[in-house]
């Protein structure tokens, strides 16, 4: 049954998508597909479709994914949606378990987790793939799966963790405690760092390598407060000759930069990134999102990021601010959606060192983004002041990128500070409600998160 269902799902993956993941339902057609994982081209095609789904339909999409929903849930983005999909409820911190948007995020992300599991199982069972191909494909699938799990855990708290293709098991699985899940992700991503090579399999860095896996591992270490391991892992990336800190503020979001660890290519040649499609407005009020005044005011006027990455739009005397990191609306030849960039590694290193009372060693890593932005570098800072400046600087650097702000506030225990700006904020809203549809299908997911 497991092998039959694997063939069904991989066949569907090569064409389109299955239905649910945690509760996928039995396939209506259980005819086996060709042996996908006996050939590296078809195995890569199966994996490529996981990438496409992650790009277009997951919590990680640069469109209506974690970047926008996390940014509006926190204090980066004002929401102007006029729809029935629940975006305004996220922005107003009034989520209910019936919210369509969170149900979609959950369902689509778990679909891709299941497909990643199918790819992992398929290459493990293959008798014909070379060892190098097997390691690479499994390593990439492990990284994709772990990244999806990481964001789902940060949003929902305790969630199901499964590496299984067994239908009956998955449809009744209970939740894994957040601490245990993060420990498991540490194990999974560590395995990915062993399986993957430093060399990229594509010159455009659209597939992750070992260093991309190490970045995620360092992020997990930081989340688990394993400061020394975070420092050691970040150092491996910083010392790699593959990467260089981009000196030109105008080049940071161009696809050819040597500071890029991993990026996602738009579906068609010339397509805009999903970030441009989501955030762009001009000569009118915002349609979807605009930057909050609170965020814009966090930048000094002489900060080059404010000048290069934020566009002010004024209509009839009223001004709004647009995220303008990605700029090409059409005929896009030089922008892909950057998932991981070296600047994050510098911030991980800075925080990990400072947490070990090595502020003097941490200063250069904090100053890197300041100096590129045209700001005066710090020569020395007391520990408490360093942590304050790191929070400010990271907010300026990573606004509207994959909810860095939300994740940071959560890790620092500072989410409740949102109550000064967001009148509906309450302490229990550190996590989102589990979707009602999932609870009804699988009562083992109870209890619902506190407050919902």
Show where each model-derived region lies.
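Hydrophobic-face positions in mid-chain alpha helices that act as interaction patches
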Residues: 231-338, 342, 397, 432
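Conserved, well-structured interaction surfaces
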Residues: 44, 52, 83-155, 193-197, ...
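Long, intrinsically disordered, low-complexity segments
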Residues: 18, 184, 273-275, 381-452
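Short, surface-exposed recognition loops and adjoining beta-strand edges that mediate ligand/DNA contacts
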Residues: 33-34, 61-81, 197-276, 380-384
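Acidic, glycine-rich segments characteristic of secretory precursors and extracytoplasmic regions
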Residues: 18-68, 442-452
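Inward-facing hydrophobic residues that define packing positions of alpha-helical scaffold repeats
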Residues: 47, 113-116, 182, 189, ...
């Amino acid at each position: 049954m497991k092998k039959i269902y694997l063939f069904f799902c991989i066949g569907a993956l090569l064409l389109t998508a299955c239905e649910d993941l945690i509760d996928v339902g039995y396939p209506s057609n259980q005819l086996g597909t060709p042996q996908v994982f006996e050939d590296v081209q078809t195995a890569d095609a199966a994996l490529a479709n996981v990438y496409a789904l992650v790009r277009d339909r997951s919590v990680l999409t640069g469109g209506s994914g974690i970047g926008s929903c996390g940014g509006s849930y926190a204090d980066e983005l004002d929401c102007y949606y006029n729809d029935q999909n629940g975006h305004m409820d996220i922005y107003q911190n009034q989520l209910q378990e019936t919210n369509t948007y969170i149900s979609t995020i959950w369902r689509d992300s778990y679909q891709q987790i299941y497909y990643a599991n199918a790819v992992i199982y398929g290459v493990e069972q293959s008798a014909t793939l070379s060892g190098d191909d097997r390691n690479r494909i499994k390593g990439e699938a492990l990284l994709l799966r772990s990244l999806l799990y990481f964001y789902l855990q940060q949003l929902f708290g305790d969630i199901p963790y499964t590496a299984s293709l067994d239908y009956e098991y998955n449809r009744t699985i209970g939740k894994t405690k957040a601490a245990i899940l993060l420990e498991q992700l540490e194990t999974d991503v560590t395995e990915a760092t062993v399986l993957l090579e430093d060399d990229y399999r594509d010159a455009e860095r659209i597939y992750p390598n070992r260093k991309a896996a190490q970045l995620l591992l360092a992020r997990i270490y930081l989340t688990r407060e394993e400061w020394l391991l975070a420092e050691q892992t970040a150092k491996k990336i910083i010392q790699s000759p593959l990467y260089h800190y981009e000196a030109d503020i105008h080049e940071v979001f161009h696809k050819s930069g040597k500071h890029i660890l991993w990026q996602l290519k738009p579906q068609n040649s010339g397509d805009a990134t999903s970030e441009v499609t989501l955030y762009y407005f001009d000569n009118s009020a915002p349609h979807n999102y605009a930057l909050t005044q609170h965020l814009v005011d966090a930048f000094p006027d002489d900060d080059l990021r404010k000048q290069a990455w934020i566009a002010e739009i004024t209509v009839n005397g009223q001004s709004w601010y647009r995220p303008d990191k990605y700029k090409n609306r059409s005929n896009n030849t030089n922008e892909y959606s950057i998932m991981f960039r070296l600047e994050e590694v510098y911030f991980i290193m800075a925080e990990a060192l400072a947490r070990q009372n090595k502020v003097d060693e941490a200063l250069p890593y904090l100053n890197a983004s300041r100096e590129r932005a045209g700001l005066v570098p710090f020569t020395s800072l007391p520990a408490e002041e360093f942590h304050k400046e790191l929070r400010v600087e990271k907010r300026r650097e990573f606004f509207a990128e994959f909810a860095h702000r939300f994740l940071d506030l959560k890790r620092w225990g500072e989410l409740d500070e949102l109550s000064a700006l967001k009148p509906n904020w309450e302490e229990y809203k550190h996590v989102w409600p589990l979707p009602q549809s999932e609870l009804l299908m699988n009562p083992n997911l109870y209890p619902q998160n506190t407050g919902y």
